[in-house]
């Protein structure tokens, strides 16, 4: 099984989406703060593109969330 289809990875992406939506941040706004096109956000959220740890850190920083807290909450379930 490729890691993009791993249930843990899918949960991680669901949590990223949840945080973004709870903060009322659109894909366009997040992409702008990351200096990426909106399609980058859409591809990650639709599981068409894998996100690496540096990108995850930048993504969470843009959402004002700590990577350590985020990972702890994703994997404690």
Residue ranges, per PLM feature:
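DNA major-groove recognition helix of helix-turn-helix/homeodomain DNA-binding modules
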Residues: 54-69
């Amino acid at each position: 099984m490729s890691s993009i289809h791993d249930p843990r990875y899918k949960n991680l992406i669901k949590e990223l989406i949840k945080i973004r939506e709870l903060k009322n941040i659109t894909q366009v706004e997040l992409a702008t703060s990351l200096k990426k096109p909106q399609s980058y956000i859409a591809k990650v959220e639709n599981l068409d593109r894998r996100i690496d740890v540096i990108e995850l850190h930048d993504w969470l920083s843009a959402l004002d969330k700590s990577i350590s807290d985020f990972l702890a909450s994703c994997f404690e379930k």
